[in-house]
């Protein structure tokens, strides 16, 4: 039986620009917002859009990501007719190898895709923060009788040269694609979200492999090839909040934007929840000496210091006299007595010693996973 649409999440990115935060885990597994990991947003969008089968394509440091996703039950993807499948590079008789690009990762998993037998494939990135109804995008794809639909978002003209830009006619049909143009003709930036008719994409990828044609990347190869061959390629115009958190600055900004009673992501909208793996932790304890203002404090935290406009993830400890401002503290971190942290990201399990000062006023500071700063050796 043919399934309508299969989602494939590209989650193998190393995320080198995130430095210490991705030395031991893939970028989509990085924590966000106190109780989530970045990939939770793509997975939750799939669940909320009614997509039953999701393939997660991993490569770099997949252990934390695999453990987090498990069997997909946190997103309702563990039913009889649904599933979350981790797809990793493997060796085969015809020379499967490490993924050479985004579309090459799809080609290497043709057998899995064929086993689902979808009419459409939805290609997603696992490292963006946003909420989107993929079913609405699919309807646009059908209405346009498209072979490929690319989700786009309007960006300021001065930033357009950082993106792949789609130039369209009055009906949103793409007539030209420019990869990071110096002088952009439009502000419609690709979000790295695509819907393809699977039969057509499959044929193109297989033929390219047989004929030794480079078709390894959607932006560099596949989209230009579709346009050159006259395929019906359209945009889906997205107007909501979307953030590429591929740099330290953008990850910090997205977390700071997430704080607040009514943020642009509408995080408290119960009609479109963001799901994640449930971690059991005791209730928070806020001491008499503590002062917490305009902050998100997740389960299991012990706070005896001052916290302002910050996020404390699960099981964070803030000792007496410590001061945290405009910072994102990941789970299990310990902030020592009298420490002062400003505009920083503190990694999971990090320990900050007494009276240590971390000042990110000029540039956001990062403390890595399990990193110890200013704590004497116990030996």
Swiss-Prot record:
It catalyses: alpha-D-glucose 1-phosphate + ATP + H(+) = ADP-alpha-D-glucose + diphosphate. One of its GO terms (molecular function) is glucose-1-phosphate adenylyltransferase activity. It is an enzyme of class 2 (transferase). PROSITE patterns: ADP_GLC_PYROPHOSPH_1 (PS00808), ADP_GLC_PYROPHOSPH_2 (PS00809), ADP_GLC_PYROPHOSPH_3 (PS00810). Keywords: ATP-binding, Carbohydrate metabolism, Glycogen biosynthesis, Glycogen metabolism, Nucleotide-binding, Nucleotidyltransferase, Transferase. Alpha-D-glucose 1-phosphate binds at residues 164, 179-180, 190. Its EC number is 2.7.7.27. Gene3D superfamilies: Hexapeptide repeat proteins, Spore Coat Polysaccharide Biosynthesis Protein SpsA, Chain A. InterPro entries: ADP-Glc_PPase, ADP_Glu_pyroP_CS, GlgC_bac, GlmU/GlgC-like_hexapep, NTP_transferase_dom, Nucleotide-diphossugar_trans, Trimer_LpxA-like_sf. GO terms for biological process: glycogen biosynthetic process. Pfam families: Hexapep_GlmU (PF24894), NTP_transferase (PF00483). Pathway: Glycan biosynthesis; glycogen biosynthesis. HAMAP family: GlgC. Homotetramer. Belongs to the bacterial/plant glucose-1-phosphate adenylyltransferase family. Involved in the biosynthesis of ADP-glucose, a building block required for the elongation reactions to produce glycogen. Catalyzes the reaction between ATP and alpha-D-glucose 1-phosphate (G1P) to produce pyrophosphate and ADP-Glc. This is Glucose-1-phosphate adenylyltransferase. It comes from Streptococcus mutans serotype c (strain ATCC 700610 / UA159). The lineage of its organism: Bacteria, Bacillati, Bacillota, Bacilli, Lactobacillales.
